[in-house]
Amino acid sequence: MLSGRCLATLALLALGAMAVPAHAATIQIVMENLVISPAEESAKVGDTIEWVNKDVFAHTATAKNGDFDVTIAPKKTVKSVLTKAGTVDYYCRYHPNMKAVLTIAP
């Protein structure tokens, strides 16, 4: 039979194992010379995307399914947090040949 001290230690270890949070990542996606880089990226719900526009004109990151629509001013960075899992095709509304895919895990 386990002692009270041993049971308390086991309970604390079990709670500690459950309380370890997953760390959200910050992922940088760059728009430069009319190209989105990387063209394919993986992330998780809760991660932050840093949309970096290095061009001298505005761009957007517009999800084809409507999940997000971010406008990034020239030479600026915009951050957004991912809230929904799925594979999202997105593009720049101003420059429709700029396309990429973001795969978001739960």
Where are these regions (language model features)?
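Extracytoplasmic copper-binding redox domains, predominantly the cupredoxin/blue-copper superfamily
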Residues: L2-G4, L13-A14, A19-P106
